[in-house]
Regions:
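Extended hydrophobic leader/signal-anchor segments used for secretion and membrane insertion
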Residues: 1-120
Length: 120
């Protein structure tokens, strides 16, 4: 699958309103000191299980393993019940994306805006 956005793309962000499940957002990942552009997969009340890199949303499989996350990954099995201030983000190219499977849920305060369109 081809990436939707590439490093260096200029994106127009909507910075008001609350992003919804399915929206593509730009979020700052403090632990890694960079901004990611990912889709919101889960919101408040959703239950996420990550097992061997596969992601299950409320019990249904929605994503395949990220390269290098299968088998002995230290994040082999995680469970999240999302609180009102959290999102679980997933990349469009799920086989290679570094997303919430790698860095966990993100707080709503980390979201810089919802992507409206790519300008350049």
């Amino acid at each position: 699958m081809e990436p939707v956005f590439y490093e260096g793309d200029i994106l127009l962000l909507r910075k008001w309103g609350m992003p919804q499940k399915g929206d593509i957002v730009a979020a700052y990942i403090e632990e890694r000191d960079y901004v990611v552009v990912k889709r919101i997969l889960a919101v408040e009340g959703d239950y996420i299980t990550v097992a061997c890199g596969r992601v299950y949303l409320n019990g249904e499989k929605v994503a395949e393993p990220v390269n290098g996350m299968q088998g002995g990954s230290r994040r082999q099995e995680l469970e999240y019940r999302l609180s009102p201030d959290q999102y679980f983000l997933i990349g469009e190219n799920q086989e290679v994306s570094v997303d919430s499977r790698a860095f966990g849920c993100v707080g709503k305060s980390a979201v810089r805006g919802t992507v409206v369109c790519k300008l350049f």
